[in-house]
Amino acid sequence: MTNIRKSHPLMKIVNHSLIDLPAPSNISAWWNFGSLLGLCLGIQIVTGLFLAMHYTSDTLTAFSSVTHICRDVNYGWIIRYLHANGASMFFICLFLHVGRGIYYGSYTYSETWNIGILLLFAVMATAFMGYVLPWGQMSFWGATVITNLLSAIPYIGTDLVQWIWGGFSVDKATLTRFFAFHFILPFIIAALVMVHLLFLHETGSNNPTGIISDADKIPFHPYYTIKDALGFLFLITLLLTLVLFSPDLLGDPDNYTPANPLNTPPHIKPEWYFLFAYAILRSIPNKLGGVLALVLSIAILAVMPLLHTSKQRSMMFRPISQCLFWILVADLLTLTWIGGQPVEHPFIIIGQLASFLYFFLILILMPTCSLIENKLLKW
């Protein structure tokens, strides 16, 4: 008799995706972040659902409903902080996942890579709208500043902003629609994840060497299910440590003040995971130029498969490219730091130099360096 997991129409899909999936025998811990992102998405959807049961998307009661969740709802405080810090964990895993894709040349699977970029945009949009919902000072002013950037679009800009706001300023209509979008987007993300995995399973996983590994595969279960379970344990430990010991470590104190349109906070800044893009936005003195740079800071990932000039796929055996990759990482950390600083000397010039270096590295230096390494192979 055939095993049910190999014959049942639904179980067969699960079997081919998680159990009998042929996987490269040498993929390292850097390949754990895909499953960790799945775990993060699951945590966010479950905690978000429970929060939505008690939250009210009205400007008069939103702030107090979040307070009510923390004070009066059974275990409301832990659900709220798991959701808030879960977002930080989500982005840590996202950045490491994308970084691994760049380092090991996984972007050459262009369909999987492009769906991944769409996912990144969707997660960023969801996180931004989620930050607006508690209706604190930083929520309100963050929403005002970021949505206002769309007014830089020629001709339709002003109408577009008012259409998104649902009026002439960020108000009740804005909060209600942000709540609606924040609720629906994670399910769209989950659907995109399925497409992401569909394309990945068409080609199979890459591995650290970047060499085709068809001759050396092992079943996903039990080898990588155990490995992923260990990753889950690490992630949950880190998340619970953050939630139980310092839940507000990554938040902004200004968001504990109810939104006041008449009083601007001294430094308007987004959550830490957007600071690198915010620094790029601020480094360009022109509004439209800044908005374009902001979008391109993520969209530039789409040109990476086109700029791959190396004869080798992975950076594992390319020391010069490795050096440039780690300069890029350091540059992104610098941009993150600058994004949280006030707009004054010397932060302005540091931000401009770091923004220039970011685009220069990806568009010019890394492809040129790959060509030089191709020449060195012949020596």
Swiss-Prot record:
**What does the note under cofactor report?**
Binds 2 heme b groups non-covalently.
Q: Enumerate the residues binding heme b b566.
A: H97, H196
Q: What is this protein called?
A: Cytochrome b
Can you state the subunit structure given in the record?
A: The cytochrome bc1 complex contains 11 subunits: 3 respiratory subunits (MT-CYB, CYC1 and UQCRFS1), 2 core proteins (UQCRC1 and UQCRC2) and 6 low-molecular weight proteins (UQCRH/QCR6, UQCRB/QCR7, UQCRQ/QCR8, UQCR10/QCR9, UQCR11/QCR10 and a cleavage product of UQCRFS1). This cytochrome bc1 complex then forms a dimer.
Q: Which InterPro entries match?
A: Cyt_b/b6_C (IPR005798), Cyt_b/b6_C_sf (IPR036150), Cyt_b/b6_N (IPR005797), Cytb/b6-like_sf (IPR027387), Cytochrome_b (IPR030689), Cytochrome_b_C_euk/bac (IPR048260), Cytochrome_b_N_euk/bac (IPR048259), Di-haem_cyt_TM (IPR016174)
What is the required cofactor set for this protein? heme b
TM annotation in the entry? 33-53, 77-98, 113-133, 178-198, 226-246, 288-308, 320-340, 347-367
Q: Where is the major localization of this protein?
A: mitochondrion
Provenance organism? Ochotona dauurica annectens
Q: What else is known?
A: Heme 1 (or BL or b562) is low-potential and absorbs at about 562 nm, and heme 2 (or BH or b566) is high-potential and absorbs at about 566 nm.
Gene Ontology CC terms, in alphabetical order: mitochondrial inner membrane; respiratory chain complex III
Q: How does it sit in the membrane?
A: Multi-pass membrane protein
Q: Which family does it belong to?
A: Belongs to the cytochrome b family.
Per its UniProt record, what Pfam families does this chain match?
Cytochrom_B_C, Cytochrome_B
Where heme b b562 binds, per the record, is at H83, H182
Q: Show the taxonomic lineage.
A: Eukaryota, Metazoa, Chordata, Craniata, Vertebrata
Where found in the cell? Answer: Mitochondrion inner membrane
Q: Which key words are in the record?
A: Electron transport, Heme, Iron, Membrane, Metal-binding, Mitochondrion, Mitochondrion inner membrane, Respiratory chain, Transmembrane, Transmembrane helix, Transport, Ubiquinone
Q: What function is annotated for this protein?
A: Component of the ubiquinol-cytochrome c reductase complex (complex III or cytochrome b-c1 complex) that is part of the mitochondrial respiratory chain. The b-c1 complex mediates electron transfer from ubiquinol to cytochrome c. Contributes to the generation of a proton gradient across the mitochondrial membrane that is then used for ATP synthesis.
> What's one GO MF term for it?
metal ion binding
